[in-house]
Regions:
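N-terminal segment of the mature folded domain
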Residues: 64-120
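Short, polar/charged alpha-helical segment
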Residues: 36-54
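A bilobed periplasmic-binding-protein/Venus flytrap-type ligand-binding module shared by bacterial periplasmic
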Residues: 112-124, 255-267, 290-291
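Ligand-binding pocket segment of bilobal, Venus flytrap-like solute-binding proteins
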Residues: 68-70, 76-83, 153-234
């Protein structure tokens, strides 16, 4: 028996390894059509495939159709980056009915919105970290069409954030300090106005959000309204086009979750556990999106850049043996 023991142990280890792989099986992952989501989906695919032995497959997805399909059909298995506010009631019901699980936060800070100014302005005028400081120095923010006014860059027309930005502009009486709302016309117009100001070290003030390539490229400071977050006010008035008497409130973070089906979580507990720990800060995601844009890279190329250059981040999400397998596959 003593001669057989090592062989039996080896067979047992091999059987356990094969069981882990078959336990995971085929995993379908929604590949959403924006940059941070396709990056996360590719990272998940690679780690599940090479670290956990899953047969991981990316399938096209988007917020509403993916969430609905997961609830009604149990597919795909994973939605890596779901901005859950837009279908919160349906997701909560899916969890209650044991069809879905909130696995973790894809973006640990949540989606971040606010009014921003360049960091070099705050270095020169520290009081401009606050809305009162910005109003005090309103004349620095040159209007491209009217020298008598100051420029506030809002969301492009038709975007939901145009409503909230306009209501907050009114709530803080920015017009009373000489500011005028500028419609940049498009996302490119808005980001281009920041790039132009930064290249010339000029004053810029307006709405923006994270995670984005722009906030990865340019050091911007979110202006403090001095109001804190009033979620009730934000939902009932700030975001409503017919809000007559808006009050100041900072933007509440938008929850950004990773959602899995209950069937996947039950079938593949080790792989599911990875999703409970995997999450990006906005600062890290901003940097990755900036690299992605500068290099005209797709989700897969940016995934390799991330795994090869940020091991201190992703190795904390997985056991040591899984990390070694992933590193060996790079």
């Amino acid at each position: 028996m003593t001669y057989k023991t090592p062989l039996l142990l080896a067979i047992g280890v091999l059987a356990a390894t094969n069981a882990n792989a078959s336990e995971c099986g085929t995993v379908t992952i929604a590949d959403m059509n924006w940059n941070s989501a396709t990056l996360i989906a590719n990272v998940d695919r690679f780690i599940l495939e090479h670290g956990y032995g899953c047969d991981a497959e990316l399938i096209p997805g988007d917020t509403m159709p993916t969430g609905t399909s997961m609830i009604e059909k149990g597919q795909p298995d994973v939605a890596p980056e779901l901005w859950s506010n837009s279908l919160k009631d349906a997701l909560d019901k899916g969890v209650e009915e044991k069809r879905l699980r909130y696995a973790g936060k894809a973006l640990v800070d949540g989606g971040e919105e606010g009014f921003w100014i360049p960091a070099y302005l705050v270095k020169q005028y520290p009081e401009m970290k606050t809305i009162e400081g910005v109003k005090k120095h309103a004349k620095l923010f040159s209007h491209p069409e009217d020298k008598a006014k100051s420029a506030f860059y809002s969301c492009p027309a038709g975007w939901n954030c145009q409503i909230s930005a306009g209501n907050l502009f009114k709530a803080m009486d920015l017009a009373g300090s000489g500011f005028d709302i500028i419609d940049p016309g498009s996302s490119a117009g808005l980001s281009g106005s920041i790039a132009k100001a930064y290249e010339r070290e000029e004053a810029w003030f307006g709405y923006y959000w994270a995670p984005t390539a722009v906030l990865g490229k340019y050091d911007m400071v979110k202006v403090d309204f001095g109001s804190g977050v009033d979620e009730k006010e934000f939902v009932s008035c700030t975001t409503q086009a017919d809000c007559e008497n808006p009050k100041p409130t900072m933007y509440p973070p938008s929850p950004v979750h990773t959602i899995t089906t209950e069937e996947f979580a039950s079938r593949s507990p080790a792989a599911y556990n990875y999703f409970t720990k995997r999450g990006f800060t906005n600062a890290d995601m901003n940097q990755l999106l900036a690299w992605m844009e500068d290099n005209q890279a797709d989700g897969e190329e940016t995934m390799f850049h991330f795994l090869e250059n940020y091991p201190q981040i992703w190795t904390a999400w997985v056991p040591q043996d899984v990390a070694k397998k992933v590193q060996g596959a790079l």
